[in-house]
């Protein structure tokens, strides 16, 4: 088989539909658009969400809530996730690079969930009491 001899499977390619080319084609006269009406005209499509002049749904429903300007950008990291990060020293930047916390996270806390098998050194990351005990039991430290 050569690259220049590759062809699509039989029936995989359909001929382009040519509309408005006589009644013998099956798609002549109205060209598949039906008779009259807005959708049969050139440029005859309304914008998404338009309901014919009726008050649209997004305007009929009341507003709700607000976006807090002081939203907390906190994240939690499981202890078992630290086991999968290469390297011995872990800080917030390394957690972001590993994809364990979002880039917008300002505060990160390690929680006791799962096990940690190797010694890691946490820098500038708060941990729960149980997580701290587990890290130190594995030979690691928290700064």
From Swiss-Prot:
InterPro entries: Ribosomal_uL15, Ribosomal_uL15/eL18, Ribosomal_uL15/eL18_sf, Ribosomal_uL15_bac-type, Ribosomal_uL15_CS. This is Large ribosomal subunit protein uL15. GO terms for molecular function: rRNA binding; structural constituent of ribosome. HAMAP family: Ribosomal_uL15. Keywords: Ribonucleoprotein, Ribosomal protein, RNA-binding, rRNA-binding. Binds to the 23S rRNA. Residues 21-31 have a biased composition (Gly residues). Belongs to the universal ribosomal protein uL15 family. Part of the 50S ribosomal subunit. Gene3D superfamilies: 3.100.10.10. Residues 1-54 are annotated as: Disordered. GO terms for biological process: translation. It holds the Pfam family Ribosomal_L27A. The gene is rplO. One of its GO terms (cellular component) is cytosolic large ribosomal subunit. Signal peptide: none annotated. It comes from Nitrosospira multiformis (strain ATCC 25196 / NCIMB 11849 / C 71).
């Amino acid at each position: 088989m050569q690259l220049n001899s590759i062809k699509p499977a039989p029936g995989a390619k359909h001929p382009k539909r040519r509309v408005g080319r006589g009644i013998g084609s099956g798609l002549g006269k109205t060209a598949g658009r039906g008779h009259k009406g807005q959708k049969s005209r050139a440029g005859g499509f309304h914008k998404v969400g338009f309901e014919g002049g009726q008050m649209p749904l997004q305007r009929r429903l009341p507003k709700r809530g607000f976006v807090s300007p002081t939203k907390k950008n906190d994240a939690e990291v499981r202890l078992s996730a630290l086991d999968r990060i290469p390297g011995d020293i872990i800080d917030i930047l390394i957690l972001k690079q590993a994809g364990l916390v979002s880039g917008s996270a300002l505060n990160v806390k390690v929680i006791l969930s799962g096990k940690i098998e190797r010694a890691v050194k946490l820098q500038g990351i708060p941990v729960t009491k149980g997580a701290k005990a587990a890290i130190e039991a594995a030979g690691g430290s928290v700064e």
